[in-house]
Amino acid sequence: YIKDERRIADSTRAALQALKQQGIITAIATGRSPSVLPEVIKQLMADTGMEMLVSINGQFVRYRGEPLATFPLGSEEVAETGRQMTALDIAYACVSDSKIYVSHETDALKAAMGNLGIAYTLGLPAAGESVYQMLAFYPPERDAEVETVLPASLKPIRWHDYGVDFLAAEGSKARGIQAALNQLGLTMQEAMAFGDGLNDREMMQAVGFAVVMENGHPELKALADHICPPVTEDGIYQGLKTLGVIEA
């Protein structure tokens, strides 16, 4: 997904179709919830016959339209985190599989959410509605202040100058992928992943073969088995071709 242009490279579509024809299961692992996937991603999944979505950083996995593995946060840790963010006057959000609920709007929230074109709902989720991840909106200079009050059961992962994910300490895309593969009778050693951001770190450490984009985060590139061009230069297609997974 080329975020700045909000489009999918034609070569990526062709690569995924080639994998499908070989009987290889393809999936998207994303920090987004299913409800805020860009339309071009939904269309890509439909066009290429992609049946698995590892969403919300691995906390909600759907296969063939049905939940395959889910890891909701505890209601008390959600409530406590909300109380702490309110005390610090920091806007926060609760992510369900269908909506993103925000406590209130701030310039920081608008900057982070607007950058990705993510829709949200003002207000908090109804009692009993599962929350899979939380978000908070503050600059890096407040990191230490927030981390001192964040429940130990959660970990912060920054994805924007003003946006941070609060994820279960043991949660990651890797956990979601592992749970999905277990259900399908496959192992992590049989999996290959492409990534570029810090929320891909555990995934890259866990899969059998890790491919990182050339423009990816330096910490992630250090974990790569192979580095391919960025998506703007047909990176996924070129990487699969170079590795001999698909033919030219």
What does each of the following model-derived ranges do?
Residues 19, 30, 134, 177, ...:
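Residue-level signal for inorganic ion chemistry
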Residues 1-5:
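Asp-based phosphoryl-transfer active-site loop
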Residues 36-39, 145, 176, 202-203, ...:
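Phosphate- and divalent-cation-binding pockets in alpha/beta enzyme and binding domains
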Residues 44, 48-49, 57, 149-153, ...:
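Short, structured coil segments at secondary-structure junctions
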Residues 125-126, 206, 210-248:
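Asp-based, Mg2+/Mn2+-dependent phosphohydrolase catalytic module
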Residues 23-27, 50, 132-134, 189-191, ...:
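Short active-site oxyanion
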Residues 10-108:
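Active-site phosphate-binding/coordination module
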Residues 78, 84, 88-194, 198-203, ...:
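Conserved acidic, metal-coordinating active-site core of Asp-based
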